Amino acid sequence: MMKVLVVVALLVTLISYSSSEGIDDLETDELLSLMANEQTRAKACTPRYYDCSHDRHSCCRSSMFKDVCTCFYPEGGDNKEVCTCQQPKHLKYMEKATDKIKNLFG
């Protein structure tokens, strides 16, 4: 019984591998056109310290991490929520440490 299970598992693996080769046979032109269409759909990102209240997932990336849309109520009694793209401090420190290590060894 165990031998039958091993043989069936081997056949399933071979069939899935052979079907994945068919996917790899797509023409290069088709792949490039799909990638070009995907890039044109990308929307512009919101720079750091700019208003992101219209789309809270639109913040730009820094060199390593994506900025986060942070919302707060400013002092002064105004009850209007303000949202800006900001880099969390722990990510800022990680980027600085990584840059120092790169400069030290690079």
UniProtKB/Swiss-Prot annotation:
Signal peptide: 1-20
One protein family per Pfam: Toxin_35
Predominant location: secreted
Intracellular or extracellular location(s): Secreted
Keyword DNA damage: no
InterPro entries: Spider_toxin_CSTX_knottin, Spider_toxin_CSTX_Knottin_CS
S-S bonds: C45-C60, C52-C69, C59-C85, C71-C83
Expressed in which tissues: Expressed by the venom gland.
Keywords per UniProt: Disulfide bond, Knottin, Secreted, Signal, Toxin
Propeptide: 21-41
GO molecular function list: toxin activity
Record's keyword annotation contains Repeat: no
GO cellular component: extracellular region
Domain of life: Eukaryota
Protein family (similarity comment): Belongs to the neurotoxin 19 (CSTX) family. 02 (D7) subfamily.
Domain notes: The presence of a 'disulfide through disulfide knot' structurally defines this protein as a knottin.
Protein name: Toxin-like structure LSTX-D5
Organism, scientific name: Lycosa singoriensis
Lineage summary: Eukaryota, Metazoa, Ecdysozoa, Arthropoda, Chelicerata
